[in-house]
């Protein structure tokens, strides 16, 4: 495993972490709506990648992880756009309560390197 410490002076991506609680019994509909909504977010300037993770212990809880080039790409570029209004129409009626959204910057990054021919 390789681990590196990032420096503030380095250009680092921002990780948006949204904790989503979906109304009971609406998970399948939420996931279907998200399959459409992800096309919106992935088209935004500054977008890098995203993952939607479902909690194993709490079936109505999800984590949305979005990497942005800069904080402002999310907080201004996306949140103040018409595309965000479209995103909200598709998804926000599923949430109970309102999602918690936080932003993180890397401190340590570790990566397991897999060598060719190794199982």
Predicted regions and their residues:
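Glycine-rich beta-strand-turn "strand-cap" elements at beta-sheet edges
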Residues: 2-11, 51-58, 88-119
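Short, well-ordered beta-strand segments in beta-rich or mixed alpha/beta enzyme
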Residues: 14-21, 51-79, 117-118
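Short, surface-exposed ligand-recognition loops at beta-strand->loop->(often short) alpha-helix junctions
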Residues: 21-31
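Generic structural motif
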Residues: 23-25, 71, 106
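Residue-level signal for secondary-structure boundary sites
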Residues: 28, 72-74, 109
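Conserved GNAT-fold acetyl-CoA-binding loop/helix
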Residues: 31, 35, 82
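An amphipathic, aromatic/His-enriched active-site/gating alpha helix that lines ligand/cofactor pockets
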Residues: 39-48, 67-102
């Amino acid at each position: 495993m390789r681990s590196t410490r990032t420096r503030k002076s380095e250009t680092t991506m921002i990780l948006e972490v949204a904790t989503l609680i979906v109304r009971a019994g609406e998970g399948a509909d939420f996931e279907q709506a998200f399959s459409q909504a992800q096309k919106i977010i992935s088209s935004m300037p500054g977008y890098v990648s995203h993952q939607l993770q479902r909690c194993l212990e709490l079936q109505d809880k999800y984590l949305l992880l979005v990497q942005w080039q800069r904080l402002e790409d999310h907080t201004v570029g996306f949140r103040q756009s018409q595309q965000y209004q479209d995103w909200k129409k598709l998804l926000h009626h599923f949430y109970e309560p309102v999602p918690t959204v936080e932003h993180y910057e890397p401190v340590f990054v570790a990566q397991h390197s897999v060598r060719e021919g190794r199982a």
